[in-house]
Structure formats: C-alpha cells, structure tokens
Amino acid sequence: MPAAKKKTKGGKQDSKKTEKKGLKGLQTISDLLKNLRLQYDVKCKDEKSFPLPTVKNSIKEYEEKSEFLVKFVLFPGQCEDCPVKISPLLSALRSTRYVYIKELYIWDIPMKHEDVATLALFLEKGIYRVQYLELMSCSIESYAVQRLGRSFVLNCVTTLLLDYNQFGDEGCEGLCRGLKNNKTLLRLSLNYCNLGPDSGRILGDLLTETAVCEIYLDGNHLECEGVIEMIKLLADKAEMEAIERAEKKEQENVPPVNNVVAEVSQMSATSAAGNGNKTPEITESPSKEDKSAITKAKKKGKKKKKKSAKKKVKLPPRVGPWIEKIHIANNGIDAHGPGSNLSPVMCMRLLRKLITHSDCLKEIDLEHNLIGDLGGRELLEALMDRKEAKLTSIKLRTTHRMNSTTFANLVKHGGGMKKKAKKRGKPGKKRI
C-alpha cells in the first residue's frame, strides 16, 4: 500500500513539471522581440553584414514596451568595408517566425538578383502579411524585377514603390506580367524608372485588369504616345459609365406604363368586390397573455436585427479601370517628341474625356509638361464640364507656361494639390 502511494505522488510531481515546462515554452512579446534581435546579430555575423543600429534600437524599444514592431527600415551604414545586407533581417524574421511585419522600407541598398529572389521568396510565404513595400534607389535590374513580379500572385501587398530603379520598359513589362493576377495592389509608384512610350500600353492594360487605382510615373519618358495608350481604355470606360448613369436617371424619373395600368386594374377590382355581398367575419380580440407573447416575439426579432446589422464585412477592392490618382509630371508631354505638333492637344483631349466622365477621379499631376495654350484650354473645359455634370471636384496641377488667364482659371477650378515636403536625408526624392 505505501508503495502505491509513492507512485501516485511521483505521478503528480511529473504532471506539475510538465505543466511548468509548457508555461515556460510560451513566448511573450518581449521574449519574441529579444529573440529576433539576437538572431539578427547572429545572421549578420554569418553573412558578414553590418548590423544596423537603428534596427536593433527599434526592436529593443518595442521590446521594452511589449508591443509588436510592424515597420522595418534598412539603409546604408557608416562602414563601407562591411555593407548592410537584406538577407540577415529576412532570415531572422523567418527563423523566429515573426509574422507581424507589415511595412518594409529599403533605401539606397544595391540589390542583386539573389537579394531580390530572397525577398520574393519571403513575400510568397502566406504567413508574412507585408502590406507596404518600398524599394527606393536599390539598383534593381529588369531581370530581377521580373522575379519580384512573380511573387505578387501570392502576397497581400497594397502599396508598391520602386522609385529610382532604372529597369526600363523591359522591367516594367515583367513586373506588370506578374501583377496581372494580383487583386490587392492599390498604389503603384514607378517614378524615375526610365520608362518609355512602350510602357504606356503595358500600364494601361494593368490599370484596366487589376485593382490599382493610384499610379505615380513622374520623371519618365512616356511622352504623348505613351500617355495616350495608357489612358485610352480608361477614358472609354468612363464615357460608357456616364451614359449608363444618364440612362438610369431617365428610368427613375419616368414611371413605367405597365405599373400604372396594373394599379388602375387593382383599384377597379377592389371597388367591385366591395359592392358585392360579403359574409361578415367574426374576429376574437386577443387575450392579455397572447399580447404579451406577441410583444416579446417582436422584441426578440428587433434584437436579432440589431446584432446582424453590427457585423459588417469589408469588401475587397474593385477590379477594373477605377483610377483615382494619375501623376505623370515631367514625362516629355510636348510637341518635341515623335509625331505631329498637335500630339499634346490630342493627349489633353483624351484626358478631357476622362476628367469629364469619371466619377472616381481625384487627382492629376501634369507639372513640367509643355502642353501649350490649346492643351490648357482642353483641361479647363474638362473641369467646367465636370462641374456641370455635378461630379466631385478634382485636384489638377499643370505647368504655368501657357496663357495667364487660362492658367489662373485652372488654378481656380482645379487647385488644391500641394507639393509634398521632401524627407530629411533624402534630397530630391519624392515619396507617396
């Protein structure tokens, strides 16, 4: 008997030990961030990369707060012999299973094809929900951009910024080929990427087939030909929608003839039935118990309706040509490119169609493009037509090199777009 008791005591002690081990196995937020910081140091030593102090300090700061760090920023360090690399941070995130990253900024760090492929493999993992990706001035080539584009089929990035990477038309084609099957990307920035007129058609197809509603293309070489190819389908779609809206309004204002005839026939039938003989129906007044039961049932039904009304599911972004912001400043939209001298007027006439009919358009930037007096006149008439159609006003910015009265009217009807302040430490670089 005493031996049996000892066994039970031993069993209880073993269960307590296992419970303690299980509690120790659970990681807190601070422990997870501490492990991430230590792993980042280890990976930097293994790959001979400079451990960026700002990354370590930001991890330590959130470790003390016991909050998840969502934003990671990488930029060149002070040590030239030991450069900052991207792979140590990504390896540390993967080894610690840190899935709370949402924003990744990489500035002025040269990225080879291997680095871009490592980043693409990281984004293809479904558990890392990166929503904002910024790769600014990283010397990404056209072949590497194609590999990055293939990763956007499986990730949930909503904003992609690839400014100051000279990958040209070939890289733009590879990137857009991968983005065609993406349904989450909303903002695309390709400022100063050496894009030519051929990229206009590629970007136009992208805007009509995906959910991208904001595009930033400042400092490229699209010229009139590229811009026309890009917005041609958008303008046609906006015009078709305007016609459909007008038809719906006409149908709502004019009542259908069939409904009027049906109402008259119903009224005549009820009057004829009222004149005929009817047997009186005896209705019993409900008792107090029945009344209380009815009121309770009504209250229950109302409560259920309130609960169901609170649950609102966010709909995914609309796929199609729903453009809201177009930034094409400094793109050579003038009469000096290939084509006739009227090419800026033709381009502005197409933009006029888009501005006049699109109900979702909010912003257009045409600064540093010599569109001329005729082009400015087309834009002014577009703003006036939009006002007559009672659509929401848009922000429009153009060059001042045109007729002074035309420019003043453009500022009056389409002003409001402010120049964004340049970020400290990044002179000359424009951010979204």
Task: Locate predicted features.
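Leucine-rich tandem repeat or coiled-coil scaffolds
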Residues: 1-432
